Amino acid sequence: MSRFFTTGSDSESESSLSGEELVTKPVGGNYGKQPLLLSEDEEDTKRVVRSAKDKRFEELTNLIRTIRNAMKIRDVTKCLEEFELLGKAYGKAKSIVDKEGVPRFYIRILADLEDYLNELWEDKEGKKKMNKNNAKALSTLRQKIRKYNRDFESHITNYKQNPEQSADEDAEKNEEDSEGSSDEDEDDDGVTAAAFLKKKSEAPSGDSRKFLKKEDEDEDSEESEDSEAWDTSSTSSDSDSEEEEGKQTVLASRFLKKAPTTEEDKKAAEKKREDKAKKKHDRKSRRPDEEEEDNEGGEWERVRGGVPLVKEKPKMFAKGTEITHAVVIKKLNEILQARGKKGTDRAAQIELLQLLVQIASENNLGEGVIVKIKFNIIASLYDYNPNLATYMKPEMWQKCLDCINELMDILFANPNIFVGENILEESENLHNADQPLRVRGCILTLVERMDEEFTKIMQNTDPHSQEYVEHLKDEAQVCAIIERVQRYLEEKGTTEEVCRIYLRRILHTYYKFDYKAHQRQLTPPEGSSKSEQDQAENEGEDSAVLMERLCKYIYAKDRTDRIRTCAILCHIYHHALHSRWYQARDLMLMSHLQDNIQHADPPVQILYNRTMVQLGICAFRQGLTKDAHNALLDIQSSGRAKELLGQGLLLRSLQERNQEQEKVERRRQVPFHLHINLELLECVYLVSAMLLEIPYMAAHESDARRRMISKQFHHQLRVGERQPLLGPPESMREHVVAASKAMKMGDWKTCHSFIINEKMNGKVWDLFPEADKVRTMLVRKIQEESLRTYLFTYSSVYDSISMETLSDMFELDLPTVHSIISKMIINEELMASLDQPTQTVVMHRTEPTAQQNLALQLAEKLGSLVENNERVFDHKQGTYGGYFRDQKDGYRKNEGYMRRGGYRQQQSQTAY
């Protein structure tokens, strides 16, 4: 029979086990007769009685505690989750809050959380270091807390005016409540449930109640004043229980707080309360003094908890070990064996390798060992990010540059060291100074990987931030390292390696405009001083000479098509960038790249598209609008210029590829500082199309089958015509459309004002290196094409027109007008003749007028209508109908309507 079904306490059951009969619990009996016949575990769970207010407020305080912990560790995602739960818990407690008022601790957490989020939001550096989830949660939570706090605006304002007072009021209120409850217990000499309730952590369970120590009571004396009212004498309780043996008493009465009955007990309790109040007052008075001392003591220093300030260096070798080449190489191989394995600390591995270099240099083990370890350090830095799309951190990137520079210093200082990827590890010579030192490794591969890492850094940095500018400054170091490796490989490398490093040098040179060389071309040598000439000589060769030298070497020595193709495209791009149109065009035509570029890999195709665009812009600067239009036609007509130039992905095409393909294509994008301005590109294309299309439309206005030179230009014209209300142009496209309409009328001044104005200068024309020359060229082209359009449009109106009049109208000199009209007459575009003595253009009027053109069109349409009707009638009558019998099959002999075929046949017979 279980002991837990006995009546009385544990002590009773223990003492009377042998001598007395156990009282059994009747099956199916009335439980109301023995309401507290419970086991110890049931006692612990059922004796805690809490009000609804306590339950709701405890739930709120637990959530607030979790939020504050998350705030300490800057876990904004956790803060967001707990804040949403806090709002729901507050909604459940709404009925209690309406009666009691909004608790102060709730207002405090709302105010503190809002201040905390504002502080995080203003910390720009901290936001950059946040992960994606925390950054997203910060934005969401900041909006939610601002919206939520509007309902508590007055409470938060009162709290912020005196936050300390609010905190003290809460503490005092809690103390008064606890003291008031204890006083009531003393006066009433009664027992309430709240008088003996304790937290689970404070309530001992099982037999441990008998063995509570005095130290436990001393530790909890400051937390609650209820401890003094508990009966500390276990012997008295035991004796009481012995006296009550055999009675069915309530077990909870053993744990009820007893009211002090004697005067001594009352005095002791009163003294304890006074001591506690005094301690509290001392703490309050001591707090401002401590704050002043802290402020005077200097600035605070933020430290990471749990991390020792002085980090001990890892021990590489046991104490007393002799450091030799074999020991260091063995240790190096041990470190490298963990490379790439799961769970390997890559940062610690890099640190160990750096420490190994330091040990090797301190023990004078030779440069060969140091070079080998340096190669592995750089390789470990590249392997730090296993994900291909992840770019290097700034500190790792700087460490990589420094390490490569140190490696190059060693190689240049020790010509007897030979490095190469074809050297086997068994044939390495790291310490024998009598023979040349041989180390396995490829410096060219390291530099190519460094260049790729630099590209990834630029791709993943916000191009409109100062951080991008700071990273772009590192290109000078990258170019310097490439130049040093170039000099090293020119002495000791193979032809293939030299071609590869030359291509790297070309890729960092081809897109840069050489302003110094351009300035020297504008300034004649006689006009420059001697110091300027000396400075120009010291600066080295121009970029044009450098590109010529590097590319010619690749043309002659390279055996791979890819390197030669890239070199040709970069060379053409550089020529076009510096307005050497004919050299760039001839090189493109001689290379025949346009015939087989579709078989090249995507990065080379992107480079080809960039080169063609730059070639078209160069032709436009030279005034060759037709060549410019032809070069830009393929890129602009596709509507995917941004994607074809590697400057971004289109949203509509994102749905056509999966996530992996998107990542691959994003890695192909060129960095922002290599981008070509797409608005400038479109403007150049549309202006070129306007200068070609408007005169052509005027010359073939009556031709129903005229072809379109540029579909995109016609599309922009149709969009402009569909506008119900035309206002002044705002965008670049609207300016070009408005200029086209003016050119149709031969109004070159209005056309000029739409193409060249302050807004267009800022958007397009000022971006050219020689902006004034481009604007002058544009004005001249607009005047010439407007003259051609005017003659095509109004030739039917004039019998003759003076060239001087045309010269005055379009502000062109007379020889230019004469040249334009002569070309039009020679090409049979204008049916006229020049009268040299009078300097007039005599129109021949062979072309039909507009009214005659309309009449001819009407006649053709009527003729086709009659023929269609006759065919329909023949089909209805059948082959043996009366029509064919009466006409004697004349229609089938081409003697139908107007007998045109017969007349022409007869005319041709008489010609013979």
Swiss-Prot record:
The modification N6-acetyllysine is found at residues 99, 642. Residues 1-44, 157-305, 521-541, 884-912 are annotated as: Disordered. GO terms for molecular function: RNA binding; translation initiation factor activity; translation initiation factor binding. It holds the Pfam family eIF-3c_N. Signal peptide: none annotated. SUPFAM superfamilies: Winged helix' DNA-binding domain. The modification Phosphothreonine is found at residue 523. Residues 8-21 have a biased composition (Low complexity). GO terms for biological process: formation of cytoplasmic translation initiation complex; translational initiation. Its main location: cytoplasm. Keywords: Acetylation, Cytoplasm, Initiation factor, Phosphoprotein, Protein biosynthesis. Residues 166-190, 216-229 have a biased composition (Acidic residues). Residues 199-215, 260-277, 885-898 have a biased composition (Basic and acidic residues). Phosphorylated. Phosphorylation is enhanced upon serum stimulation. The modification Phosphoserine is found at residues 9, 11, 13, 15-16, 18, 39, 166, 178, 181-182, 908. Belongs to the eIF-3 subunit C family. This is Eukaryotic translation initiation factor 3 subunit C. It comes from Bos taurus (Bovine). The lineage of its organism: Eukaryota, Metazoa, Chordata, Craniata, Vertebrata.
